[in-house]
Amino acid sequence: MTLKVIDVSAHNGTILWKNVKGRVDAAILRAGYRGYGSAGTLAEDKRFRANAANANALNIPIGAYWLSQALNEREAEEEVAYLVKLLKPFRIAYPVYLDSEYCEQNANGRGDRISKVQRTKNALTFLKAVAAAGYTAGLYCAENWFTAEIDGEAIRKAGYTIWCARLAGKPRIGDHDAWQYTWKARVSGIPGDVDMSEFYRDFARGGADAATKPTTGARKSLDTIAAEVLAGKWGNGADRKKQLAAAGYDYAAVQKKVNALIRR
């Protein structure tokens, strides 16, 4: 299964979403960012609310990403608290990603020169908080960043979905659920170039492809279901609750187990 997914921000200008509909399978929207200056001010993407509202109105599945410049775990938690408030009014079917990359051309952003160990701690804190808020959490980064600047393998082993950018060909990082392969796609309704990715899991339909989608045949343990929830295989929010109930699982018990796993 391969899905066409764009990612957009205020830099893409005013988007005519009615023209976009039917040309892509989903969109990942920049919700906001922490400024890369010393103040580190939290900010909302100027087009996020309009993009999210218009995509929701047309039933175009959306996810979100947040560009982090957190210096420590406390700031990572602060970023998620701000982010979740932005997301709450909207239907978020696709993952909520931590965008980990240099934020200033010469790597002089406030968070650009923290250690790999600290950046990984920040990322794990961020993603745990996103998952605790009921969203599928994931990491976005470039292929070289996955090993050089962050411990991508530790994040993958923790059960978070991976979205990797590589313009020269498919990422060589092992398992990943999405590949951003160009920054210069063209889609009707979007002025100029737009980022395009291939996604290999349909998060809008429970977060798994046909080979891995949860089934209702065999009864699974609470630990197994909770792990699948963290891996994004049961969707988000109300959709997750509906799917778990339809499969005969106690949503409250599963969510309690998920929260316990996150706190480990």
Identify the meaning behind each predicted range:
Residues 247-264:
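Repeat-associated, polar segments at repeat-unit boundaries in modular proteins
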Residues 1-18, 153-218:
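Functionally critical loop-and-helix segments that line ligand-binding/catalytic clefts
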Residues 214-234, 264:
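Disulfide-bonded cysteine-rich modules in secreted/extracellular proteins
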Residues 1-133:
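Substrate-binding cleft of extracellular glycoside hydrolase catalytic domains
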Residues 130, 134-148:
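Aromatic-lined carbohydrate-recognition surfaces of secreted/lumenal glycan-active proteins
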Residues 62, 136-138, 162:
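Hydrophobic anchor at the start of a short beta-strand
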Residues 230-241, 249-251:
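Extracytoplasmic Gram-positive cell-surface binding/anchoring modules and repeats
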